[in-house]
Amino acid sequence: MSLNLDEKKAVVAEVSAQVAKAQAIIIAEYRGLGVGHMTQLRAKARQSGIYFRVLKNSLARRAVSDTPFSGLSEHMVGPLAYGIGSDPVAAAKVLHEFSKGNDKLVIKAGAMANHVISSSEIASLASLPSREELLAKLLGTMQAPVANFVRTLNEVPARFVRGLAAVRDQKESA
């Protein structure tokens, strides 16, 4: 299905808006991937907050021109799907996990902040913990000293109460 000029401009504007908010873009070749598998991939991407779309490469080049992701233009060859996300790890995880289970999806390249990354670097990125997991670990690390301090403060009166209880028990038994 060919798009007229106004539709092409609308697609470029929509994708450009997503690219402006993005931290990472990952491109993958989907040659031979069935509709059912592509629908599953889209659903997983949507759940992870990833904008996932199949685009004409010429429109994608226009959308990323004059952005930190313009280096991806040289990799935009063949039937490609674009995963655009504000969390680089989430985008890498979704596409990498799906490509492990389906050999028809081949990750070609990606980009983060003026840096084009290879498919092996995307695999490494996918093995990192997600943003939420890192924030949870950070919060736990920050709360640990405070929690230990509170336990220490609570131990002083608790020890006093246990001492009084021991004295009471000793006097009652005597």
From Swiss-Prot:
This is Large ribosomal subunit protein uL10. GO terms for biological process: translation. Part of the ribosomal stalk of the 50S ribosomal subunit. The N-terminus interacts with L11 and the large rRNA to form the base of the stalk. The C-terminus forms an elongated spine to which L12 dimers bind in a sequential fashion forming a multimeric L10(L12)X complex. PANTHER family: 39S RIBOSOMAL PROTEIN L10, MITOCHONDRIAL. InterPro entries: Ribosomal_uL10, Ribosomal_uL10-like_sf, Ribosomal_uL10_bac, Ribosomal_uL10_bac_type. GO terms for molecular function: large ribosomal subunit rRNA binding. HAMAP family: Ribosomal_uL10 (MF_00362). GO terms for cellular component: ribonucleoprotein complex; ribosome. Keywords: Ribonucleoprotein, Ribosomal protein, RNA-binding, rRNA-binding. Pfam families: Ribosomal_L10. Belongs to the universal ribosomal protein uL10 family. Forms part of the ribosomal stalk, playing a central role in the interaction of the ribosome with GTP-bound translation factors. The gene is rplJ.
